A protein has these predicted regions:
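Short glycine/proline-centered loop/turn elements that form peptide/ligand docking sites
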Residues: 71, 94-97, 114-120
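Conserved catalytic-core motifs of GNAT/GCN5-like acyltransferases
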Residues: 87-89, 107-124
């Protein structure tokens, strides 16, 4: 998982990020092909909602709709937890992710200015998206 995270993310989570997220009781969903991990997501349950914290697909498996498979699995899990919606934030510059989220029914619900750290001590906006279940 860490290898995919490092290869797929511009600002990857560390082992500590994953450990903290899982210790807090968050959900980890993995997409496997045999013994090979193709992608994963981490989501946080909430009161009648869920929040996508991280999603990555191995670079060699990107462009095959696997993010959509993971997002549909997330929606099923969230419904099972009693959620009415799923929230996420994505970097404004991450057009590929934003397209994938829109294809899966997410709609922009807001903007968080300067939410993410960026290059050269700059900050990057986050697009807040919501999927009603």
């Amino acid at each position: 998982m860490l290898a995919i995270e490092q290869a797929a993310q511009a600002h990857p989570w560390t082992r500590g990020h994953f450990a903290s997220a899982l210790a807090a009781g968050n959900c980890l969903l993995g997409l496997m092909a045999g013994e090979r991990l193709l992608g994963y997501l981490v989501a946080m349950p909430g009161v009648q909602e869920a929040h996508l914290l991280n999603l990555a697909v191995a670079p060699e498996s990107q462009g095959q709709g696997l993010a959509g498979v993971l997002l549909r699995a997330l929606a099923l899990w969230a419904r099972g937890q009693g959620a009415a919606c799923v929230w996420l934030e994505a970097r404004a510059s991450n057009e590929r992710a934003l397209r994938a989220y829109r294809r899966c029914g997410f709609a922009q619900a807001g903007l968080r200015r300067g939410y993410y750290p960026g290059a050269n001590n700059q900050r990057e906006d986050a697009i807040v998206m919501r999927l009603d279940l």
